[in-house]
């Protein structure tokens, strides 16, 4: 049984680290091939993805004595500690130096290639070049680190750990649920889709938060509804204070969110993981969560669909209520940003709107005019979509007014009933 079994998911990364770990554990096997031990590996990625856990598993699997360095001392003392630690590791023989949160050794807000902490790390690695010292590091942002430190011969492998997605996210949710007392109605697939691209730490927090809801209500099991409430809190900071009164504001919010749902579902069926029109205090009266495979858009069609989805709430409100939607500020801003990227950076409508360096007033005006023109076209497409699917829109609106929150399955049942 491998020590890496403690880590849920990340099978590709674990396989690579197990292979490297074998070189560290059994150098003689590789010496016969003329292969030398890699000098070091860096794991980097967003906070909470499990970098430190993966590093600890590597150390345990290797069986080597380890020396840990992290920024828990004043700058001057840290430099001395770095030098002393590498010297101790070299004297030990076969050892691992673990640099935890390496990007925090100096000012992590900017790139400081000449920071004395990084110079000390580089010098330490170089002094151990002909020894059996292996260097393992974690970092949130590798781009804060100097290129000279990241080069081969110092860190031969720089591996990104991303937030779990798809099957990996499902495995993580199921793992955390297995440690709690829950009912069998919890759909781990749905929760994983809702929490797509969030860290393992976020997933753990959601499951724990759901347990708090259950405990406070005096129940002995976590339900799917508890999980949805916890997701709402984590993703959108949705407050608990809601009004039970179906007033004009609640109606506008329900229609607005229903517009997002209709557009998203017609453009890509099954893409809405949940929608809520809880009448929350503040500008955000509701939320519609749309599942995407990637955090970036890979085609013009994905840009088009994104913009239409964003404008569909405004389109639905103004179609059904007959008034200007005053709660669509964030939607409009995000839609404009996507349209500006299409027009400018991606030259989707020609190269004459591309900005390279300082743009002239004439170019800016031309670009703004084209963006506005395209945005009007997108808005008309959004209005057409919600108008031609009024029955779907009305049924989602009615369901939101009654239940406030709808899951993917409930949205599917509404659509199938039409």
State each model region's role.
Residues 17, 42, 59, 155, ...:
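Residue-level signature of catalytic and energy-coupling elements of molecular machines
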Residues 25-33, 131-132, 239-245, 266-275, ...:
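Active-site phosphate-binding and catalytic loops of NTP-dependent enzymes
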Residues 46, 249-254, 261-418:
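Soluble catalytic regions of large protease machineries
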Residues 103, 258-260:
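Short active-site segment of divalent metal-dependent hydrolases/proteases
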Residues 107, 182-197, 209, 225-226, ...:
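Short conserved motifs of the RecA-like P-loop NTPase core
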Residues 193-225, 232-240, 261-273, 343-349, ...:
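AAA+ ATPase "lid" subdomain C-terminal helix
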